[in-house]
Amino acid sequence: MENKKKDKDKSDDRMARPSGRSGHNTRGTGSSSSGVLMVGPNFRVGKKIGCGNFGELRLGKNLYTNEYVAIKLEPMKSRAPQLHLEYRFYKQLGSGDGIPQVYYFGPCGKYNAMVLELLGPSLEDLFDLCDRTFSLKTVLMIAIQLISRMEYVHSKNLIYRDVKPENFLIGRPGNKTQQVIHIIDFGLAKEYIDPETKKHIPYREHKSLTGTARHMSINTHLGKEQSRRDDLEALGHMFMYFLRGSLPWQGLKADTLKERYQKIGDTKRATPIEVLCENFPEEMATYLRYVRRLDFFEKPDYDYLRKLFTDLFDRKGYMFDYEYDWIGKQLPTPVGAVQQDPALSSNREAHQHRDKMQQSKNQSADHRAAWDSQQANPHHLRAHLAADRHGGSVQVVSSTNGELNTDDPTAGRSNAPITAPTEVEVMDETNCQKVLNMWCCCFFKRRKRKTIQRHK
């Protein structure tokens, strides 16, 4: 092919040659001659549907199968690149239950791109849908699955370190895994078994905070190295968040982020488990007491923890039928999903202007605690409304970039340039990433109820 004049804003104009395989690829891809941005040989990039601590998320389409996918894009010049590491962790995890499938990783112009399975709404989105309280039955069905999910992650020599409702998603409506709770976003994960020595990482103190302050373990607040016990304690805090509707350490005020995180940690330590779990089954307190007493190196007894909740589940006479509290409700269809809101489409410029104004007002937002050389990024406008409810604030960006065909949201030729959101160093513990935290887009107004085999 003849050399073309260089253009700083465009990648290679050639269409990548078709390939039947997906996975890691070192060949760069970019805009085709038709102006459509491509990732790999067969993934077309569509509209922006969200952003996170990696960069931004785009809707995509596999041109070979006509299936929609999620495409994570991270600037190659990122100060703390993590997408390649996350890809390696996904490959390490393989195809376990509730683990998103990864289809491709490779360069895309000035970006690294990872193509993943597209999932449904997050537990935080569904929590909002259910008036911010889950029933005991729903929490137990979630808990039983997530203990197994975390056990699987740990079995692959990884600790997760980022427990929060926004990182647990149901499957896409109509999919056979639509009621399975998936775990996503391994940007903060870490190997706790040294791959060379095969030994557990050493115990250390004076570590910087990594994770989401609202849910992280007490030992993490104290600067102790995280291990398997901390993932399970964070899950316990999240379970109580679902049952109670909020946690005692939410909404604390302080002059600085450091003081705020200190207050959160102090309040966690000062809140007896009996008080935190008051008016709820004793098993909730038993769970937290057990995980908080674990030694740094100790392997948790996952079967014991699961049995706590399965026995309670059976004693209450519940059936594991996946009839969650949100079943029968209309699932959220966020701005930027496949189904365009006509009003939003016709008033795109007004919405973009509003989003820019909101972004300028929230530059000093205190968002989730993600030190350890990690990055954070602005989130969707809906998150701002939720953050107000919790006394927090977040940065906002528009997620409606690009004019896209309503029949095929990845077919647009006038997508706005992919730009990296403003980088900041810390984020507030409210971490209201909402619908667009990862690839949680809903493509159908109503879901089909479908009973699937019980997950352990």
UniProtKB/Swiss-Prot annotation:
Q: Residues where Phosphoserine occurs?
A: 414
Among Gene3D superfamilies, the record links this protein to: Phosphorylase Kinase, domain 1, Transferase(Phosphotransferase) domain 1
Q: Name one GO molecular function term.
A: protein serine kinase activity
Q: Which PROSITE patterns is this protein grouped with?
A: PROTEIN_KINASE_ATP, PROTEIN_KINASE_DOM, PROTEIN_KINASE_ST
* Reactions performed catalytically: L-seryl-[protein] + ATP = O-phospho-L-seryl-[protein] + ADP + H(+); L-threonyl-[protein] + ATP = O-phospho-L-threonyl-[protein] + ADP + H(+)
Origin species: Pongo abelii (Sumatran orangutan)
Annotated Basic and acidic residues bias = 1-16, 348-370
Question: Which protein are we looking at?
Answer: Casein kinase I isoform gamma-3
Write out the catalytic residues in the record. 162
List residues binding ATP: 49-57, 72
Give any single GO term for biological process: Wnt signaling pathway
